[in-house]
């Protein structure tokens, strides 16, 4: 079901506020990767310990469907606000009581925030925009992912350089509070006693996991997430050790990733509705597969390595974002449940990738590229032969 679309000016303000909120959330999630070594040094543990925490975070991510009923019960806007409260609590905990345990708890709370915030936002937008414009609208909100790398991570690098690994946590909590106030002002609360709040959440979830069309599309998300995470958990160490980069330089190299992701998201916004969601996803998978295979062989010099990373993250982002509008309409009668389950599959992929990434890196960086390419390529036959786009 798609409700009456928002008027354009109102939707524009809502998109800006929601994107700001996503930049804050995703900065908290993503700053761990380039500064993994700095954080591990600050905690006095080896980098592999942080990678293990990331893998556990992915395992926790598979609990995302349990949060779907909360979104239905409290409403879309209130779920977003609740998610931001959870985020601020996790960030503040690390700032006040830094330890390996508090970092782990914060990781879990940041993911819990995403369980609440992102399905609520995507469901709200899907209910207020027609499918013919869904790729554009969801593609625009995904600027909150690249914006974290373009704006948030360089800011975190600056703060770490001026202070220590703890310095970014409290400012991020303050920005999370600001995002909550902004979203509460521009996005209205759901009407009371909505139909989706009364629906049987267990029955909806069972109908989702029994739908081969949905499961195939979500499996594609799992595969490409696993591929990307197997690179995420090692690229900071690869660049720092291989090219002798400082923390600030590592923060600046993430700008390359941010620009590539921004272009990938813009590509989905521009092309997904024109090409068709399924065709756009197949294009992204094919290009992403090729870029992973090529990356290890262009890493002899920093300039070529950054060019390879640019291609990898551009094509990955195009593929992962192209899947979102497609998934949002596979079962519109259970949209929030589908989107919550999508986060679980995405998190499962992250868990697999985090577990594999360090081990592959110990064998040689070339195996990170080969494994990521193979995992991404497995998604192509699923889209070709199983997934059918709902018109």
Predicted regions located by residue number:
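Juxtamembrane intracellular "pre-TM" segments in multi-pass secondary transporters
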Residues: 2-9, 189-217
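Helix-to-loop junctions at the C-terminal end of transmembrane segments
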Residues: 64-75, 264-276, 361
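C-terminal transmembrane helical hairpin of 12-TM major facilitator-type secondary transporters
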Residues: 278-323
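Cytoplasmic helix-loop-helix junction between adjacent transmembrane helices
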Residues: 107-144
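Extracytoplasmic gate region of multi-pass secondary transporters
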Residues: 33, 215-255
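Conserved MFS/SLC helix-loop-helix module at the cytosolic interface between two early adjacent transmembrane helices
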Residues: 63-98
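Central cavity-lining transmembrane alpha-helices of secondary-active solute carriers
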Residues: 55-68, 255-264
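Helix-loop-helix hairpin linking two adjacent transmembrane segments in secondary transporters
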Residues: 141-185
């Amino acid at each position: 079901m798609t409700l009456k679309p928002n008027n354009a000016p109102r939707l524009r303000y809502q998109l800006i506020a929601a994107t700001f909120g996503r930049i804050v959330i995703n900065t908290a999630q993503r700053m761990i990767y380039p500064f993994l070594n700095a954080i591990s040094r600050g905690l006095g543990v080896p980098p592999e310990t942080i990678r293990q925490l990331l893998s556990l975070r992915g395992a926790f991510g598979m609990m995302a469907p349990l949060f779907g009923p909360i979104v239905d019960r409290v409403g879309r806007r209130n779920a977003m606000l609740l998610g931001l409260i959870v985020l601020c609590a996790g960030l503040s905990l690390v700032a006040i009581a830094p330890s390996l345990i508090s970092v782990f708890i914060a990781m879990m709370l940041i993911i819990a925030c995403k369980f609440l915030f992102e399905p609520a936002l995507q469901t709200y937008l899907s209910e207020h925009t027609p499918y013919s414009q869904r790729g554009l609208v969801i593609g625009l909100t995904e600027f909150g992912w690249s914006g974290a790398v373009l704006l948030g991570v360089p800011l975190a690098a600056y703060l770490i350089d001026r202070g220590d690994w703890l310095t970014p946590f409290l400012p991020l909590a303050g920005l999370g509070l600001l995002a909550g106030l902004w979203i509460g002002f521009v996005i209205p609360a759901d009407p009371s006693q909505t139909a989706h709040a009364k629906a049987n959440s267990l029955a909806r979830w069972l109908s989702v996991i029994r739908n081969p069309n949905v499961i195939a599309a979500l499996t594609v998300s799992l595969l490409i997430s696993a591929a990307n995470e197997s690179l995420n958990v090692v690229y900071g160490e690869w660049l720092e050790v291989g090219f002798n980069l400082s923390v600030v330089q590592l923060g600046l190299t993430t700008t390359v990733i941010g620009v590539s992701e921004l272009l990938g998201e813009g590509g989905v916004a521009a092309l997904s509705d024109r090409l068709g969601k399924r065709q756009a996803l197949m294009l992204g998978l094919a290009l992403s597969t090729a870029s992973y295979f090529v990356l290890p062989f262009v890493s002899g010099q920093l300039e070529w390595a950054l060019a390879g990373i640019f291609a990898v993250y551009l094509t990955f982002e195009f593929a992962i974002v192209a899947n979102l509008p497609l998934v949002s309409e596979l079962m519109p009668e259970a949209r929030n449940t589908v989107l919550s389950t999508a986060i679980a599959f995405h998190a499962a992929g992250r868990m697999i990738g985090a577990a594999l990434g360090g081990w592959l890196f110990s064998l040689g960086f070339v195996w990170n590229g080969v494994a990521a390419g193979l995992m991404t390529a497995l998604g192509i036959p699923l889209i070709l032969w199983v997934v059918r786009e709902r018109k």
